[in-house]
């Protein structure tokens, strides 16, 4: 399986660690923040990994890979956005944009840490920020995770062995190991406003390592691949998607009795022989739409909906709008009523002022390539 060398972005554009933190501190000090009047007590951002929404039954896939979220959707609990693409093909590239005001169109000479970030802004808005991760804090892909985690009030990584040291993805625990940690924080954290980043290992290859045996629901016989090897890999990926559905649902379940809103996206997608003899994710120049078509889901608790019916109506009414994940910070802020000097309402997909952007992929409009 071939994967993009997007870790080169992390190495070349990471910056000296001391310089990074000094710059982030300066930006945070300059940022003007208004916490607003909604005062949502619980805000959760789940960042998944390598999940192509075209392999989710929630989005119409032929195998029942997302029964838990489908059940919630059938009950009207979810807003399922069906035209959202990732801002990049690889984790490091996406991480350099999703948590800050940087975008795909940014000046390439301006490093990621020179843009105001969501964690610092939410903390200035009075949120106690918790970072829970099943990804690596050090290594080819882990550096962004570490930097953003350290901007939080507290952070916890399930494993710390970096990919460069032979650990990383291979050393990852099952994502459900994050659930007891989340339970502990919810039990012990007495802060009135809490923000959680939950970074999953998701459906990252090696797929068969992403789920326990009890979630081995699909076999090669269920798959359309041209060879036994392809079918086996596809079935393992679909099992990983199935398990990921369970984990996301379990996270949501923990906020059902609270005034809470949960956002879920995957960092990027995955091509499994969908467009040719290729499995993995590549550079954009060699990429396919499967590598960027990601799930974007919003769940809100009954309490949130009762207190913010107008906002929930806007969220539900925006599910068919074209969007890209490097602007998600603005949507999150809009949903919880936080504004700042870096917030731009036109980038919130749920806003009446949303300005649809041109989504360029591999030098051409994404819509034209997909039609």
PLM regions: where:
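Active-site-proximal alpha/beta segments of enzymes that process anionic O-linked groups
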Residues: 1-45, 50-224, 293, 324-355
